[in-house]
Curated annotation (Swiss-Prot):
Gene encoding the protein: rsmH
Family: Belongs to the methyltransferase superfamily. RsmH family.
Source organism per UniProt: Spiroplasma kunkelii
Compartments where found: Cytoplasm
This protein's record includes keyword S-adenosyl-L-methionine: yes
Top-level taxon of origin: Bacteria
Function statement: Specifically methylates the N4 position of cytidine in position 1402 (C1402) of 16S rRNA.
Name of the featured protein: Ribosomal RNA small subunit methyltransferase H
Keyword tags: Cytoplasm, Methyltransferase, rRNA processing, S-adenosyl-L-methionine, Transferase
Catalyzed reactions: cytidine(1402) in 16S rRNA + S-adenosyl-L-methionine = N(4)-methylcytidine(1402) in 16S rRNA + S-adenosyl-L-homocysteine + H(+)
EC class name: transferase
Amino acid sequence: MEFKHQTVLLQEAISGLNVQNNGIYVDCTLGRAGHSLEILKHLPNGKLYCFEQDEAAIVVSEEILQKSKYRNYEIIKNNFVNLAAELQLRNVKAVNGILYDLGVSSPQLDDDKRGFSYRYDSPLDMRMNQHQGLTAKTVVNTYSQEALVKLFQDYGEEPFAKVIAKTIVIARNEQEIVTTFHLVEIIKKSLPQKILKKAKHPAKRVFQALRIEVNQELFVLQESLRQATTLLAVHGRLVVISFHSLEDRIVKKYFQSLTKDPNYEINQQLPAISYFESDYHIITKKVIVSSVTEQTNNHRSRSAKLRILERVK
């Protein structure tokens, strides 16, 4: 199967990075190299480090980059939670920009063997790194009913989490749940007809929750962002593209925490002025979203949100 991937918010992300031609940059989510290629166009005398843990993506991106004229890059085959450690191994102490393009890519969704999509009948896998142990099949068949409820509520914001979890437990007691379509069928049985008639696919929230759990996406994001901000050089930029509210909330709150006076509540009660000056500045006071044209051409860009942080001292 041939997979197509359209890079989301490409020019907005590159503009946000404010690429210096001799700088050091990191693409934490190489994918199909869309953002990386664009960064390299602006980086004739610098270096780009590209993180990717998905072997299928690495094979494709290596081929794409090898066909380009650029050689000032290195692909790091690791999860971006290991950002600081991998750069330390390369004696990189500070960088001028870091980019995250979060979530599952179009080729991953369209791969009928990976289990990311509820639109294809495939094994319940959902691993970004196919060498890790935990799969969606393990979660669905071994987690307690209470754990599944919490998972669907916290990571999927699923209003019918309780009844879906209960139906899953009943179903797996009769037969192990091993495919995406089997799980979709169980979810549909759990929901009222008025929900099934809505445009949004009834399994969307549950699949999101399972994917986040399998790949520990929210923990990994929080930990990697913490490392990223400490690695930024003065005037370095951190650009993050997210695709659902849980990710965007983490990014937004983390950026705010870096720029807000830690004694804000105390200072509010005092007549004196606060002398707090943050090391960071939020460039995007208003989140950047895809244009109407991009949304028309690539429907997966509709949920994309881009935020930018700059280190100022």
